[in-house]
Amino acid sequence: MVKLDYRALGLKVGLEIHIQLDTGRKLFCHCKPELKNTEPDFRIIRRLRPAMSELSSIDPAALWEFRKMKTMMYEGFNDVTCLVELDEEPPHEPDEESLLLALAVSKVFNAKVFDEVYVMRKVVIDGSNVSGFQRTMVIAHDGLAEFLNYKVPIWTISLEEDAARRIEDKGDVTVYRLDRLGIPLIEVSTGPMEYPPNSIMEVAWLIGRTIMNTRRTKRGLGAIRQDLNISIAKGAKTEVKGVPELSLIPKVIEYEALRQVNLLKIKDELNNRGLSRESYTPDLIDVTSVFSSTKSSIVKRTINEGGIVAALKAPGLRGILGFELQPGRRFGSELADRVRAWTRLGGLMHSDELPGYGISKEEVAAVASRLGVDSFILLMGPQGVELQEAAKVIVDRIKEAFDGVPEETRAAKEDGTTYFMRPRPGAARMYPETDLRPIRITFELLAKADKYVPEPIDKQIERYTSMGMSRELARQLASSEYSIEAEELIKKYEDKVNPTLVASIFVNMIGGMGKNIEQLNIIQVVDKLLELYVNGRVTREAIQDTIQKYVEEGGRRGVEDIINEGGLWRMQYSEVASIVKSLINNGVKDKGKLMSIIMRDYRGRVDSRDVEKAINEFLSSEQKS
């Protein structure tokens, strides 16, 4: 792959970091903010339709969702769902603790808090909000986050309700679960930054960790989500939704920049070929007869089910339809994305990838001859509106290619590539909530928020290094989801246990195990092991072995049972001295070799300090004699 010069390209990236808050209630009702994995207590069916805003306009993203003609099924629970989520009751006053947390985050990022905060309705009719809109409040603006070597412009800090969980798609029905709907979220939106992709990832981490230092954020899958706004100098702003992991951010940025570079190359090539957007029309030609004896299972199945094969002329696009934009994704993939997004069809085939899919060279030549063009697109499905709609969106996307990069919202895949989700939302998407009064931000509220103001992440790292941790370990602990628990245990065993040991337990021993610490009570396990360590009953190595066994067993047995079975109780000094004496008497007199043998044969049961002390004593006495 070509290495991109991001500075020369004029790469700019903005971040939107969303973090769920761990408060006592949902944002606009008094239901518990908990996710459920049991059978729902009830289900309801809804259809959402767009309506004109107060400015007499319809948001294009909302219209796009409506045209998919989806039905929504909502699963609810009596203890975490009420009439507010069902849009059968007005919202309650916003949760004060959530508001205080948003104010605290605004303070740490030096943002200007608005004197008065308005609850707004953001149009969302993908079904994730029963009402058809998400309630959101812009709390502060125009901030500046300074940490490590970065200066990050903070555009807005918002407090909003999370959406319902998408569970599955059943044909034309999408199933959502209402337990997550209404859980408070803080959204931090940055201005465009010109840092390279790896630095953008670090900035996202710094923002997220700083918010988590309020100690009022949720954990687990989906608790933190990142969106990216990416553009290059001659391209367009593209919003990439739902980057699942921080580590994927650099790859998503790289691939989106590459995609925009290649779309600009296509624009230039279209002009060089003297092509005109007027040459492309959504007129379909039925070419089913060409495939009467086809060996393609895809085509054969369509015809057997009563469908047709329709061809769309794409004059002059030979080599362009198959032009790679991102690894494994071509311009034809962009067209297929639009078809899948706007219709129920599964995609398309184009002449640059044929012969293929079981379609023969002769069939390709026959279609080209019938159409009288060098390149074409094939669509398959029931004859009617779906095929016509697919042809229209394909032609629209081809015409957009003459302008270069279209503004759109895309979704991130696990390999870092992206696909089309929907058009970029317009200004009509947001309008005031009519059921709630504005919130006056008083000095009293600002003072109450002070207790939630989080410690900046760079200050946290400095504090850890002052405890004797290496900078790398301090950084790892600061980025660990267990940093709060580690600090509590460091404080509990102050002057008795080296903070570096506590940090390494959480970073190196637990950090990579991928288990839910709440379910396994792992904090209590570490606490018990540190207590035994302080009392001289277990070694550092035994702590690691016991934790590993405990996690492997899913917490089935207690700490002392595991230690008993593994014979991991720490040997008394007299036992260690006896082992050392025996080895020396048998001719092993090299200090390094003695240490190696004993630590290998009695791993987890002997403390290295006891071994070293005994070796020094016996070797010293032997030299004197």
Swiss-Prot record:
Reaction it catalyzes: L-glutamyl-tRNA(Gln) + L-glutamine + ATP + H2O = L-glutaminyl-tRNA(Gln) + L-glutamate + ADP + phosphate + H(+)
Name of the gene this protein is made from: gatE
PROSITE patterns per record: GATB
GO biological process: glutaminyl-tRNAGln biosynthesis via transamidation; translation
InterPro entries the record matches: Asn/Gln-tRNA_amidoTrfase_suB/E (IPR017959), Asn/Gln-tRNA_Trfase_suB/E_cat (IPR006075), Asn/Gln_tRNA_amidoTrase-B-like (IPR003789), GAD-like_sf (IPR004115), GAD_dom (IPR029351), GatB_C_1 (IPR042114), GatB_Yqey_C_2 (IPR023168), GatE (IPR004414)
NCBIfam families xref list: gatE_arch, PRK04028.1
Keywords: ATP-binding, Ligase, Nucleotide-binding, Protein biosynthesis
Protein name per its UniProtKB record: Glutamyl-tRNA(Gln) amidotransferase subunit E
Family to which this protein belongs: Belongs to the GatB/GatE family. GatE subfamily.
Presence of keyword tRNA processing: no
HAMAP family in the record: GatE
Lineage, highest ranks first: Archaea, Thermoproteota, Thermoprotei, Thermoproteales, Thermoproteaceae
EC nos: 6.3.5.-
Protein role: Allows the formation of correctly charged Gln-tRNA(Gln) through the transamidation of misacylated Glu-tRNA(Gln) in organisms which lack glutaminyl-tRNA synthetase. The reaction takes place in the presence of glutamine and ATP through an activated gamma-phospho-Glu-tRNA(Gln). The GatDE system is specific for glutamate and does not act on aspartate.
Quaternary data: Heterodimer of GatD and GatE.
Alphabetized GO MF terms: aminoacyl-tRNA ligase activity; ATP binding; glutaminyl-tRNA synthase (glutamine-hydrolyzing) activity
Cross-referenced Pfam families: GAD, GatB_N
Enzyme class: ligase
CC per GO annotation: cytoplasm
Organism: Caldivirga maquilingensis (strain ATCC 700844 / DSM 13496 / JCM 10307 / IC-167)
